[in-house]
């Protein structure tokens, strides 16, 4: 049977891609990628696009749900492009990711007799992120929207409270929207390159509790910055830093090269593996701090350093990995290009 657009086929999902689509095969062996499906699903699928050896489809009906399928805990799932696995259990997500690693090593890498240890899973699967970048735009009716981009697009899905972010981030967005309305702040249009406010970039120190709010603008600043600071300070006692980042380039890169602090410090602090670090808008910092501590601890265990050894931390960036091991060696040397 020749597969055509809008054909309806029955599929059993047998595997998954890195982007979260399930994969099933037709009776003719053609792979069909179905977003929002789960391994084990028996589905009625409408074909959306046909290529030479594969096709894309969407779920018309779930005939028999996978045992791993759960009710998504976010109303924006399948609209927002941020998450791919909210419709399956975390245990199933880890299982899929483990299988992808094993396939990469054995099938692609061609290595045999490799022992794979189980994934070290995260204790927290919600509210664990310490940074978010919210694009700001206008919908078709001219209303201000902030949130995250739709899957494979630059269409902003309005999201007032992402369950991966601390709840305080949602309050920052609400205050900022109030400020935009009061001051009639122009919103950046990436198509024309005109407008002022591009992104709202928020960081928090999980241990310190310190909050940084950075506004990315297509200008040198915002109008009535004093009012903005006053509005933020009045409701956010943990506010440590408010920064204006200028990005006048017509680019997908979020941050420009120039920062200007309009309140407080130019950085916040946080703690990783007992060490305190300063974090600016430009700093690389692990998004999931607690999981990073597990990762670094395991790396330190595998390194099995001796007190008379010199540790080279190559392409070290901030140097967090090496610094967390410095107490176990004679000398630490970090190198960054």
Specify the residue positions occupied by each region the protein language model found:
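Accessory RNA-recognition modules of RNA-modification enzymes
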Residues: 1-337
């Amino acid at each position: 049977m020749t597969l055509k657009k809008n054909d309806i086929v029955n599929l059993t999902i047998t595997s998954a891609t890195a982007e979260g689509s399930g994969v099933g095969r037709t009776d003719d062996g053609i792979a069909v990628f179905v977003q929002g499906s789960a391994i084990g699903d028996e589905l009625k699928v409408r074909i959306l696009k046909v290529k030479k050896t594969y096709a894309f489809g969407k779920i018309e009906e779930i005939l028999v749900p996978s045992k791993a399928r759960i009710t998504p805990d976010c109303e924006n799932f399948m609209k927002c492009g941020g998450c791919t696995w909210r419709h399956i259990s975390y245990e199933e997500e880890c299982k899929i990711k483990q299988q992808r690693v094993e396939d990469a090593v054995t099938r692609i890498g061609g290595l045999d007799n490799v022992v794979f240890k189980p994934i070290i899973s995260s204790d927290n699967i919600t509210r664990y992120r310490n940074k978010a970048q919210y694009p700001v735009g206008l919908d078709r009716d001219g209303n201000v929207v902030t949130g995250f981009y739709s899957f494979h697009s630059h269409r902003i899905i309005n999201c007032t409270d992402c369950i991966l972010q601390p709840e305080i981030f949602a309050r920052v967005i609400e205050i900022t929207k109030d400020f935009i309305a009061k001051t009639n702040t122009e919103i950046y249009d990436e198509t024309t390159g005109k407008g002022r406010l591009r992104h709202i970039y928020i960081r928090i120190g999980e241990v310190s509790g310190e909050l940084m709010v950075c506004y990315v603008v297509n200008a040198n600043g915002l109008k009535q910055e004093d009012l903005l600071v006053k509005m933020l300070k009045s409701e956010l006692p943990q506010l440590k830093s408010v920064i204006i980042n200028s990005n006048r380039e017509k680019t997908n890169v979020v941050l420009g090269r120039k920062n200007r602090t309009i309140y407080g410090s130019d950085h916040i602090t946080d703690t990783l593996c007992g060490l305190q670090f300063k974090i600016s808008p430009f700093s690389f910092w692990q998004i999931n701090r607690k999981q990073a501590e597990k990762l670094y601890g395991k790396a330190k265990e595998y390194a099995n350093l001796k007190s008379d050894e010199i540790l080279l931390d190559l392409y070290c960036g901030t140097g967090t990995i090496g610094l967390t091991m410095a107490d176990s060696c004679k000398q630490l040397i970090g190198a960054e290009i």
